[in-house]
């Protein structure tokens, strides 16, 4: 993480996970994502109110995350999102490096546009491995409601990613924000292609109907919400897939891969019919 940004966040008052979940629980929330350079993030977040608190786990202000994403050989999960299909799904494993906990997660969106995320605990050794047995059956049960349950048998690990996350509780407990840094990814479908973005910061705010103090600080700094996905955007950069949804983000933060595909050392993947 950028040293200045790390210092800004580390100087905030701390909060534990149980208290964070209790105070920031919201039945309805609006999520906004922002992508910006670390220098800009440091300048903006230096104006956080003093009442802002940062999550500490085992004395650590920054928690490491590792994710593995699953898709079919024809990239059906990716394409459903990239082409803005109303019904879609995403499958991944997520591991929390500070605690050693791992989960299998399924995120679905149904015909009414409501996104639902379900997860089940798995062992550390299972994270990122091919789906099998009851794990695959569990995923199939969650994906079935989207109408794409028939794709689950073809799911395989396609992308591994890691990053560090700081989680903020905003004043009054009216929302939270996450700050992701040290982002890196490795393709599991080619020759181990890697994409790293050490100077990129992704901030996601989670608030009620009213924008949070972090949203207002970002807007005042000239930073607006963007479309970005740690899975979709990177797969588009690596493999030059249809990506209208993320074109602006690709052009600004992954332009070297977009303009020079040989950097990725990977050929375009086959498209679903």
What are these regions (language model features)?
Residues 1-273:
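Phosphate-end processing signature that detects enzymes handling 5′-triphosphorylated RNA
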């Amino acid at each position: 993480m950028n040293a200045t940004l790390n210092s800004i966040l580390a100087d905030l008052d701390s909060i534990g996970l149980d208290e964070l979940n209790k105070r920031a629980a919201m039945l309805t929330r609006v999520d906004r994502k922002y992508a910006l350079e670390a220098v800009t993030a440091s300048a903006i977040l230096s104006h956080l109110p003093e009442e802002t608190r940062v999550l500490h786990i085992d004395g650590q202000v920054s928690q490491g995350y590792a994710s593995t994403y699953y898709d079919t050989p024809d990239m059906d999960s990716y394409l459903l999102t990239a082409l803005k299909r109303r019904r879609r799904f995403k499958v991944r494993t997520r591991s929390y490096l500070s605690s050693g906990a791992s989960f299998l997660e399924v995120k679905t969106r149904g015909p009414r546009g409501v996104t639902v995320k379900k997860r089940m605990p798995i062992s550390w050794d299972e994270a990122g491995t091919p789906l099998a047995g009851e794990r695959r059956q569990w995923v199939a049960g969650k994906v079935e409601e989207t109408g794409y349950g028939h794709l689950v048998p073809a799911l395989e690990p396609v992308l591994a990613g890691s990053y560090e996350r700081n989680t903020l509780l905003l004043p009054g407990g009216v929302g939270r924000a996450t700050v992701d840094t040290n982002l890196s990814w490795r393709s599991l479908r080619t020759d181990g292609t890697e994409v790293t973005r050490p100077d990129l910061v992704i901030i996601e705010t989670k608030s009620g109907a009213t924008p949070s103090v972090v949203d207002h600080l970002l807007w005042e700094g000239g930073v607006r919400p963007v479309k970005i996905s740690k899975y979709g955007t990177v797969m588009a950069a690596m493999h030059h897939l249809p990506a209208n949804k993320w074109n602006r983000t690709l052009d600004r933060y992954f332009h070297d891969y977009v303009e020079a595909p040989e950097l990725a050392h990977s050929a375009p993947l086959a498209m679903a019919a």
